[in-house]
């Protein structure tokens, strides 16, 4: 099933679209729910309800995992189901599973890397092409690297959520976005990166 409030009368899958989440939640044949809504509300309620109903959940929702991941992982463990969120960091580059499983016996002292492709593109343009921030951002938007509303990227929110997820898995204690000083790149000038 696909939960969507819109109608798709011409779709060959129109009988799979539902407007009531309980249809999905109460169907014993559904064992995995994929959340693609984003944000916290109503995603959190749907994901939590799915886990409590004994259904595994797959999501790429960074905000949900960063803010509610510890609770949702605990519920999944208690219910004997999976809560998968590999695509929430690195667009599916395998980092979550290795941190959670393969590297769990290792002591991790530091996490370093490029956490946001949009800001990396913008900063690279500023450094290599001496572009002003606004011009580099507009270029990123024109090429499809930046959203029309790029605030989550350029204000550091996206990177903050990702580092919370990675730090929580690496250091064994949930790290919340509110506890991380977050500063974006909007005030950086070409002179700053020269």
Which positions does each model-derived feature cover?
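N-terminal glycine-/serine-/threonine-rich beta1-alpha1-beta2 phosphate-ribose binding loop
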Residues: 1-52
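A generic structural signal for short
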Residues: 34-36, 60-61, 124-125, 152, ...
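Rossmann-fold NAD(P)-binding glycine/threonine-rich loop
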Residues: 37-53, 60-102
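General beta-strand structural signal in soluble alpha/beta enzymes
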Residues: 17-18, 35, 58-60, 83-87, ...
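Conserved beta-strand termini and adjacent loop/short-helix elements that scaffold enzyme active sites
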Residues: 5, 20, 86, 178-180
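Rossmann-like NAD(P)H-binding beta-loop-alpha module
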Residues: 30, 77-146, 153, 157-158
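Substrate-binding/catalytic subdomain of NAD(P)-dependent oxidoreductase enzymes
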Residues: 135-194
